[in-house]
Design a protein with these regions (language model features):
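Glycine-rich phosphate/diphosphate-binding loop of Rossmann-like nucleotide-binding domains
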Residues: 1-39
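Flexible, glycine/charged-enriched surface loops at secondary-structure junctions
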Residues: 32-34, 134-137
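Proline/glycine-rich low-complexity loops and linkers
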Residues: 46-48, 52-59, 63-136
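Structural motif
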Residues: 37-48
């Protein structure tokens, strides 16, 4: 199953992309493309494009901001009028928590901008959910 990655104000893109591709291949996911956004508007545009042909999109970065640029703030504003089936925190003992949102058959996974942390999340609390989704598709 194909998926896409959107890096949002991420600093460790090449390291994260390599770790993410490796983790996702183990879950039966193939990264179709990777895109980049530096602000909330660009993130929105990239997500619309990504969801136009993939049902699973991963965003990396933006979790460490404490202002309106925070991906948590941007996504809260974006989905406030959308009914989500699942909105779950992906606990990460090694740093920033990730998040998973599902609306219908589309899934957005928000991950920290750190290869070790995203690897821990994808091999930990997100693994069973994503594996089950891929198998059911």
């Amino acid at each position: 199953m194909n998926c896409r990655i959107v890096f949002y104000s991420a600093k460790k893109t090449s390291y994260c992309e390599k770790a993410l591709r490796k983790s996702l291949s183990g879950l039966g996911l193939n990264v179709k493309t990777a895109a980049y956004a530096v602000n909330g508007e660009g993130l929105g545009e990239q997500l619309v494009e990504a969801f136009s042909d993939c049902d699973i999109v991963f965003t990396v970065g933006g979790l460490s901001f404490d202002d309106r640029r925070s991906i948590k703030t941007v996504m809260s504003n974006a989905v406030r009028d959308i009914e989500t089936d699942i909105c779950r925190k992906l606990k990460n003992n090694g740093g920033e928590d990730g998040y998973i949102l599902r609306a219908g058959n589309q899934i957005l996974v928000i991950l920290p901008d750190d290869p070790e942390q995203l690897d821990e999340i994808l091999h930990g609390c997100a693994a069973d959910y994503l594996s089950a989704y891929v198998k059911s598709a």
